[in-house]
């Protein structure tokens, strides 16, 4: 599921060449003239040169060469206007097809890939203490301050997810067994099965923004969007007020069905599922026994919903920009998908600390092996070497309003993504 940030066509597969039936006609056309039609779609037009006809012969006046004008997304002025309109600091310049991911990785300092056990366990300490503080705040807060306590606790427990996230990418410790244990324990309070998520998330990184293949993010298909009024309304409301909790649907859909995994993965998946169900079978009754149903809502459910707010919001912001290339596998470019197809966003400092810089997302997609505590140094290097290609933003109301009210619709017949407003 994806959304985009403009009211016009922002992604197109390539210049459309009008079919020419005869060779003598081909000489009368000059390619490279772009225009904007009444629907706001960019199209390539052809200027026909007139033939001067006499009774005896036909003289063809050949076209004068006209420089090809850049598509709007390649225009610095256009990208600057998009950034201003939709809350971005910068909309990245499209990356050339001949750039490889290795070209992007090579300039990164070697130290950003190094694992530091002290820093890794420091992040665990931050998450555990901030979560414990949140539970204490919930226990002591009067009813009118409970929302603030839930916001803090939900954000703190999101840090647990980021720790498990590093473990899954093998960037937490040099010991894989330690990573699997820590990752499983970090995911258990979220009732998120660690191994199923790891398998599916690895595929997301391997096939980022690849149509039909990416397990985390893709546009809505036009035929689905327009198929029936009922389904269209379901998509509209799903992409509207409930969008900040859509990760719950993703969690249910992708991580509990054994048929979605390879036979070699199933044993590890079963272990993770057993751990999650053990937490439900033991943890939930214990919470209810000590605090009652309202205590379960206060101490577990509300922070869990807060976590899913951040899970959904981070994912939406990371993968939404005015120019995100979605392509089929035969046209997909790894460097474009990871550098052009992801977004860096700055949040209030306390959120970045509790969530271990998960918002510094572009270097994480360039190489998932970079530990969370080295992402800022890696991003600084990317800014120095590839700065003009980066999508960057600061979290703001304009950005969130756009993400909540516009979705990206892919038209497979035209091989392009256009934008549909889903909410007023």
UniProtKB/Swiss-Prot annotation:
The keyword Protein transport does not apply. A motif (Histidine box-3) lies at residues 361-365. The modification N-acetylvaline is found at residue 64. The keyword Iron-sulfur does not apply. One of its GO terms (molecular function) is omega-6 fatty acid desaturase activity. It is an enzyme of class 1 (oxidoreductase). GO terms for cellular component: chloroplast membrane. A motif (Histidine box-2) lies at residues 201-205. Disulfide bonds: none annotated. Keywords: Acetylation, Chloroplast, Fatty acid biosynthesis, Fatty acid metabolism, Lipid biosynthesis, Lipid metabolism, Membrane, Oxidoreductase, Plastid, Transit peptide. Its EC number is 1.14.19.23. It is found in: Plastid, Chloroplast membrane. It catalyses: a (9Z)-octadecenoyl-containing glycerolipid + 2 reduced [2Fe-2S]-[ferredoxin] + O2 + 2 H(+) = a (9Z,12Z)-octadecadienoyl-containing glycerolipid + 2 oxidized [2Fe-2S]-[ferredoxin] + 2 H2O. A motif (Histidine box-1) lies at residues 165-169. GO terms for biological process: unsaturated fatty acid biosynthetic process. Pathway: Lipid metabolism; polyunsaturated fatty acid biosynthesis. Residues 1-63 form a transit peptide. InterPro entries: FA_desaturase_dom, Fatty_acid_desaturase. PANTHER family: OMEGA-6 FATTY ACID DESATURASE, CHLOROPLASTIC. Chloroplast omega-6 fatty acid desaturase introduces the second double bond in the biosynthesis of 16:3 and 18:3 fatty acids, important constituents of plant membranes. It is thought to use ferredoxin as an electron donor and to act on fatty acids esterified to galactolipids, sulfolipids and phosphatidylglycerol. Belongs to the fatty acid desaturase type 1 family. The histidine box domains may contain the active site and/or be involved in metal ion binding. This is Omega-6 fatty acid desaturase, chloroplastic. It comes from Glycine max (Soybean).
């Amino acid at each position: 599921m994806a959304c985009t940030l403009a009211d016009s066509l922002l992604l197109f597969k390539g210049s459309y060449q009008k079919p020419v039936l005869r060779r003598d006609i081909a000489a009368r056309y000059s390619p490279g003239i772009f225009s904007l039609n009444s629907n706001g779609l960019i199209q390539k037009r052809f200027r026909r040169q007139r033939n001067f006809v006499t009774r005896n012969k036909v003289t063809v006046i050949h076209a004068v060469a006209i420089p090809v004008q850049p598509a709007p997304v390649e225009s610095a002025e256009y990208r600057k206007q998009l950034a201003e309109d939709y809350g971005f600091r910068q909309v990245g310049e499209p990356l050339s097809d001949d750039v490889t991911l290795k070209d992007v990785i090579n300039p990164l300092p070697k130290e950003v890939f190094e694992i530091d056990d002290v820093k890794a366990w420091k992040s665990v300490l931050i998450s555990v203490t901030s979560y414990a503080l949140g539970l204490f705040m919930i226990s002591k807060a009067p009813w009118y301050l409970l929302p603030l306590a839930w916001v803090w606790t939900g954000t703190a427990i999101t840090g647990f997810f980021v720790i498990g996230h590093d473990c899954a990418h093998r960037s937490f410790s040099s010991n894989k067994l330690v990573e699997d244990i820590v990752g499983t324990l970090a995911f258990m309070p979220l009732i998120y099965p660690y191994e199923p998520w790891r398998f599916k998330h690895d595929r997301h990184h391997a096939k980022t923004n690849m149509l039909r293949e990416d397990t985390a993010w893709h546009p809505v298909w036009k035929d689905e969007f327009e198929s029936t009024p009922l389904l269209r309304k379901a998509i509209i409301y799903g992409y509207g007020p409930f969008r900040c909790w859509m990760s719950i649907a993703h969690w249910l859909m992708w991580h509990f069905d054994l048929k979605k995994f390879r036979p070699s993965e199933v044993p590890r998946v079963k272990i993770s599922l057993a751990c999650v169900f053990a937490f439900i079978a033991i943890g939930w009754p214990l919470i209810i026994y000590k605090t009652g149903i309202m205590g379960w809502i206060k101490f577990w459910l509300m922070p869990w919903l807060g976590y899913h707010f951040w899970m959904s919001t981070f994912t939406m912001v990371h993968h939404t920009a005015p120019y995100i290339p979605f392509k089929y596998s035969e046209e997909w470019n790894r460097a474009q998908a990871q550098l052009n197809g992801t977004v860096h966003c700055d949040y209030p400092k306390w959120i970045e600390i509790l969530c271990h810089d998960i918002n510094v997302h572009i270097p994480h997609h360039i190489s998932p092996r970079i530990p969370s505590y080295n992402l800022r140094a890696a991003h600084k290097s990317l800014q120095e070497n590839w700065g003009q290609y980066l999508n960057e933003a600061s979290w703001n109301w304009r950005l969130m309003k756009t993400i909540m009210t516009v979705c990206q619709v892919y038209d497979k017949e035209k091989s392009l993504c256009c934008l549909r407003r889903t909410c007023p």
